[in-house]
UniProtKB/Swiss-Prot annotation:
Its EC number is 1.14.13.-. Glycans are attached at residues 387, 405, 462. The lineage of its organism: Eukaryota, Fungi, Dikarya, Ascomycota, Pezizomycotina. It comes from Cryptosporiopsis sp. (strain 8999). Cytochrome P450 monooxygenase; part of the gene cluster that mediates the biosynthesis of the dimeric xanthones cryptosporioptides. The pathway begins with the synthesis of atrochrysone thioester by the polyketide synthase dmx-nrPKS. The atrochrysone carboxyl ACP thioesterase dmxR1 then breaks the thioester bond and releases the atrochrysone carboxylic acid from dmx-nrPKS. Atrochrysone carboxylic acid is decarboxylated by the decarboxylase dmxR15, and oxidized by the anthrone oxygenase dmxR16 to yield emodin. Emodin is then reduced to emodin hydroquinone by the oxidoreductase dmxR7. It is a single-pass membrane protein. CDD domains: cytochrome_P450. This is Cytochrome P450 monooxygenase dmxR5.
Amino acid sequence: MNSTPSAPPLKMEALDLDIFQPSLTLGLGAILVVLMSFLAFLSYTPSFDKKVPAFTTHTHPFIGAADFMWRKNHFWRASMEESKTGTFSFWVGKKHVVGLSGEAARKTFMDSPGLDFVGGARIRGVSLLPNPPTPEIFRPGFHHGRSFFLRRMIDMQKTEMLKRCLPRFTSDSRGVFDELAKDPSGITNPAVACWHVVFAHDVILFCSEEIVDDPKAFPNLLQMIDILQGLSSFTKVFLPWLPTMAGMTRARRYKYMKSIFEPLVDRRMKRGAIRREDSLQLMIDNGDRRDLIIDFVIAAVIIAPTNSRILTGQMLNVMAAYPSWQEKAYAEIKALAKSYAKDPEAPLADQLDSMPLEAWEAGFPSIDLCFKELVRMWVAISMMRRNISSRTDEFIPAGSFAIYNTTETHFSEELYPDPHTFKPERWLEGNANVQKQAYGFVGWGEGRHPCPGKRWAKLQLNITIAYALAKFKWTSVDKTEHKKSTQESGHGVPLPSKLSKFSPREEN
């Protein structure tokens, strides 16, 4: 039998790696060059005049003072302890920052026309928008040197506007605590309980109640603002050029907010549109541009609740922790409400409904004392400015940033003996400690940048707290948490988690 011889097996040649070695070496070298160039870019810092304060050692390679974002108060204290002059420099990514302390530096920080308040926000990491350029609503020169934002903020807090909104403010606030009475647990987080009405009233005052009354748009907006207030972005401050998921998320949120406000503004600006007596109508009647109106409203509803969402809840926690002050405030509420009541025998909440604006603003001295002390202890932050002057041979060079930490003032033993203890009586007339230094209290801003929303913030708190105390007696669950006055998180402002008990007042 003939057999066909099989084909000889193929000869497998060994793979010659030498063929690929040059390409592999070239690729690895290219990656290494790119990596080294990137690290060199991160490490590069420009030179400065010798007047600049010495740099703190509390930094991290390549990115600089990351603790400024992560543990800001620890970073401040550690850098000050190291400093021989009470000042220090540090890098936030590529941004040069000067930390200041002392009375003279504080006065310069507050009064200098070259230190820009809006520009300082670039190192906070909380904005929805890319850092530069400064939005037009914040640029000076709109009216007597003021920005569009400041001018309209002031307009919307005029007496006529507040009187117009007052019935809605009081009815909403009362409604919050009427609803809370249905909770069988008798325990709540006051900050969470008040957050809805605080934000709703900010939207009503600075835009229109049409948004608040929209059953779909308002809950979504409330949730979005709540998330945004608790966030601060490390990469936005240290690596602003780096595309991140967080940055894209912020851009989507900004776009969504515009989708809420733009249709309302467009509808109201049409010829023959139904008029409403609100702040949106005020801007339309003034002939303000559409883009300025939309940017103002978005900025206002983000900025306005930043502190009020914290302080309103904390004020109730304070009332719960200090029964004597709660009862003083309650007695003042009862006396004032009765003096304006149509029926002095009606429930206290009904009596409050009849009070005029001037009574709401000036009739609660104990609440005012407690609020000022609360602001002292809780507004413990790093204030930030940017030098927008053209001179580079300065202590704070042109383009650099300056920060001042308010804990130096608000927790000064000289100005506030026993500063970590809540003592509203320290603000009674005749107590001159706080007058010992220039700007001994900066809770409402000072100098060239006083808080433009102070009137509204105090009125809003008075209304909310008055109805809360009229309906309930508050008791502290944890009598220590109210003393916590600083955060070691980022620059965001998450809601406090403290709980308080509430029980109906017998007289109601």
